[in-house]
Amino acid sequence: MMNFLKLLATPEFFWSIIRISAPIIFATLAAIVVEKAGFANIGLEGLMMFAALSGSLVSYYAKSWFWGLLAALVTGVLMSLMMGFFAFKLKTDIILVGIAINMMGSGGTLFLCKVITNLTQGKSMASTTGLITKSLCIPDLTIPVISSIPFIGKVISGHNLLTYIAFLLCLLTSIMLYKTPLGLNIRAVGENPNAASSVGVSVLNIKYIAMGFSGLMCGFGGAFMSMAYAQGWSLDMVAGRGFIALAAQAMGGGECLGGMLSALVFGFAQALGIKFSAIGLDSNLASPIPYAVTIIGLVIFALVRNNKIKKLHSAAALESK
């Protein structure tokens, strides 16, 4: 037991928590913004899958990780706007649209990968891992001064570029939501669309903007998965992170800081599962750990929220007397 605890107290373990949390943070920010706009996007998983595939393919054919990243971002935005078109313009249930995107993200990406590689490589490939080299992946960054600090330097320095962008975007998204007119409009539309419309806010445009933002974040998350976390795209590589992000958004109370901390909790759970597997624990027992933590976290969040609601109702009842 003591040896296992020593493994958890290493800088490498904390470094892995941050690394694993990055794609969850991107997807959590996507969930937060659309929730502020008054609707849910459960298609985060599928959006990340499409972004991951397009990013890795464009990176290979353009021989540049930058163009691959740009392709992933564009894919995420365009597909999220397509979701918005079906939901807002055609009045399709947005939950059903999200389910459809998630299903397409699994089977559709595999189909596209096989078709594209068959046309360009002469054979159908079920993944792009054989195409992407280290030079085509998004680079890691070593922070000169911080890297020399004992323990902390090994935890903070040496991460992928997108990992630092994920944490920076937590701050920038919070500023956008609470310190800018756009953020005010997003929150107004989410709280009372009729009131927002009465003062000249275009509810439809704001919803499209929120949807586009969620797609942008999923683009970052997908690019991270196929061009940083792994070298290339493979089937179902997102592995439920889109759904975990929905849980992180709920646990974080719909706020950027809370969502980031919740994502780190889930990152810790996944890193713990990997450690358990490394020391010989059956993978069938280790792999469910992140999902068990997700369920436990949501139960705790629901209990705390319900307790707060009961206290508010009790206080309101006393004041009315």
Predicted feature residues:
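Single transmembrane alpha-helix segments in multi-pass membrane proteins
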Residues: 12-61, 65-69, 73-74, 78-95, ...
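Hydrophobic core segments of alpha-helical transmembrane domains in multi-pass membrane transport
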Residues: 27-28, 52-56, 106-110, 163-176, ...
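Short loop segments and helix-boundary regions at transmembrane helix junctions
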Residues: 36-40, 79-141, 239-240, 244-256, ...
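Loop-to-transmembrane alpha-helix initiation sites
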Residues: 95, 122-127, 160-165, 207, ...
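Transmembrane helix-bundle core of multi-pass membrane transporters
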Residues: 106-178, 281-286, 313-321
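Helix-loop-helix "hairpin" substructures at the membrane interface of multi-pass membrane proteins
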Residues: 154-233, 257, 261
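Cytosolic-side transmembrane-helix boundaries in multi-pass membrane proteins
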Residues: 191-198, 202-205, 276-321
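Transmembrane alpha-helical segments in multi-pass inner-membrane proteins
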Residues: 218, 228-291
